[in-house]
Amino acid sequence: MKRQFVFFAMMIFAVMVFAQGVYTKPCTDKALEKKAVKWVNSGKWRNGFKMATPHESVNVVEFYTQYKKNPEQWKAMFKWLSTRDLLTIEKGKYTIEGTKLIASVEDSENGDLSERKSESHYKHIDFQFVVKGTERFGIIDHETSKPNSQYRPDVIHYEYDNNKTLFYDSTPDKFFIFFPDDWHIAKINTCLLYTSPSPRD
């Protein structure tokens, strides 16, 4: 299925812990976690952007922490999103003035899981918002994954266990953020059923 989405490569320097594995950067500071959740729910980060909220997979502590480190970058990104017609914008790459952000607008097709590479970034943050159509994302387990390539700025790929991977389908009211500790797969077909381990098992 073709879908229109907006992807940001965020030049911000920078593990979700389930019983089944490790999927993101952990937080042991309950006070910070509570503050981050309250901040996200308050919508103070929106800067006029009202189309979507963070997907449940987003590490809200990292979102809060990275936003506080680089508020002007995040404000500019959300302002850009709020002042564009994302359903009709032309495909291409857009530099957001006054920032290190690049928005990549694509209209493409998903692929089979076997054709998609997992990845993570040491310095970048991926913000992905599918505004039309559906895209499946996967988040892979750190404990059962290992690099299968040399790092090249700014990406590295992994071998991973499908059965330990968490899969999520996009909806137009949610966006995804993949921080450096979120090892992920994008552009996966949604026509096949993948079984994800339950985070509450």
Regions found by a protein language model. Name each.
Residues 104-119, 140-143:
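Conserved short histidine dyad/triad with adjacent acidic residue
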Residues 36-104, 115:
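A short, N-terminal "cap"/entry segment at the start of jelly-roll beta-barrel domains
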Residues 169-187:
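Conserved metal-binding segment of the jelly-roll/cupin
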Residues 194-201:
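Conserved small/polar residues in nucleotide/adenosyl-binding loops
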Residues 1-27:
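Bacterial Sec-dependent N-terminal signal peptides
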Residues 21-43:
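Short N-terminal segments immediately surrounding and downstream of signal-peptide cleavage
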